[in-house]
Amino acid sequence: MTLFSSISSISSPMTSSKSSIASFGSGTSMGSNSIACGGGCGGGSGSILGLGLGLGLDLTGGSRSSGACGSNRGSGNRGHGHGHGSMGGGNGSCCGI
């Protein structure tokens, strides 16, 4: 189980979901696929800020690799996925990974 998050470059918040976030949590690579998924599923208005925060905080905190996607699909926490984004069925049904 690799808990390692590396955010390469996050564009300005509120831009298109094209920021390069390379994060690896629990052996699942979260590259451009995750950005497209998280932007559509979690950030309703496509806010990279929420997506970046959710991915970064969750990965650093534990094995919740898809915080932005998992947490937002449930409670709409806009990237504050501290405990909701569990990398299981939630992530799968949301991102389709």
UniProtKB/Swiss-Prot annotation:
GO BP term, example: sorocarp development
Compositional bias annotation for Gly residues: 84-97
Biased composition (Low complexity): 63-75
Chain positions covered by the region annotation Disordered: 1-25, 63-97
InterPro entries attached to this UniProt entry: HssA/B-like_chaperone (IPR050533), HssA/B-related (IPR008455)
Protein family membership: Belongs to the hssA/B family.
UniProt name for this protein: HssA/B-like protein 35
Native source organism of the sequence: Dictyostelium discoideum (Social amoeba)
Gene, per the UniProt record: hssl35
